Amino acid sequence: MGIGRFAFTPILPLMIQEGTVHLAQTAWLSSSNYIGYLVGALSLLKNNRHPLFVVLGLTLVTLTTWLASLSSFDWLLVLRFLAGVASAWVLVSISAFAINWLKSRQVATSGLIYTGVGIGITLTGLICSYFIFQSATVNVAAQSLSSPLSSRLWQYLGVIALLATLVVTFLLAKINSQFASTAAATTAAAKAHPSKAAHTKASHTNPTASITPAKLKLANVLTAYGLFGFGYILPATFLPQIAKQWLSGQSYLLIWPFFGLAAALSVVLSQDLQRRFDNVSLLGVWRVSQIIMAVGTLLPALWQSLAGLMLSALMVGGTFMVVTMAGLQVAASQVTHYPKYNLSALMTASFAFGQLIGPLTALVATGKNIWLALLPVSAIVLLIGVALLWRPYQHQQSSNHV
């Protein structure tokens, strides 16, 4: 997913430089991807076939990544849409499947699955940065004899995605077989002791009177998660392009690998907090992380230097997967009255709607320094989301930890 969802970001400055796409078209390509992400999430609202959609999503990621090397702008719109659908299938399905499977094995570090996205971002960033840097030392005549570098990068990443998909498919089939055996044993035990099973079910069923408060909580959580999608998406999509505009030489190539590394390590750090401090709540982690993200989003508008952009990459990259993880787990722990919906899909759909609006704001602004106006707006939206999280829960303490 780190490839299919985010490879576009480090390749984008190169595609603009080569003339494959123009700056004005990038918002359309981004929006196409985010529409696909929304459609993919909505398509899974009532789906429970998680392993199937993980494999389908990864397969589609592989195809769309490789085919991007051959495509014109019109076809890129279609491919970015399909890549968005595939990414939503992967995130929703692996979140629902893997967390449940790990919990069934009493593994306390289920959130570590989210390091995968950061690792994928880091990998794509390093590969793209290496080849872009190397191409700067090749003479123009030699470059003219080969295909555009952006096309070759899409092909390289497509091959990596294919290899990873084959490995994941094999491992997922093995894990799913073990999970099915465990579920069958649990069902057999429940049939053997029906009174105990009925008592357990009743003890976890809330009274009808509590349904209305739960709906209010769901509305606040969904809205806050959607605002997170809007707020984070501009730096997460355009930070390397911003860096290329404002920095000299090849130093902008450092930004995206650093962003991905921060994303991967931040999830590990949040898991470590659980082991060290029992009073660290999921909701608290969400709030604090989103405040840090807001500051990191605003930073490039105030500090246009390598240090400022690196710090922004650290603050946004180091929080967005933590917020993703915490948001999905807060929703699952706070809302228990919607069994007919896949809650991960519902949350992801809200997020997708928010991130869809983000790039569209870039369409109404023009010029090299449009980010000076747009990034503060994103930061304000993130803080509004934090305010929504504070009010409904200010008298409530969560017992769930990251």
Show the residue positions of the predicted features.
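Extracytoplasmic gate region of multi-pass secondary transporters
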Residues: 9, 217-257
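Conserved MFS/SLC helix-loop-helix module at the cytosolic interface between two early adjacent transmembrane helices
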Residues: 39-72
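Helix-to-loop junctions at the C-terminal end of transmembrane segments
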Residues: 39-51, 266-281, 366
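Cytoplasmic helix-loop-helix junction between adjacent transmembrane helices
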Residues: 81-116
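Paired small-residue
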Residues: 74-83, 307-315
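Helix-loop-helix hairpin linking two adjacent transmembrane segments in secondary transporters
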Residues: 73, 109-176
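A late C-terminal transmembrane helix in Major Facilitator Superfamily
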Residues: 335-369
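C-terminal transmembrane helical hairpin of 12-TM major facilitator-type secondary transporters
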Residues: 281-327
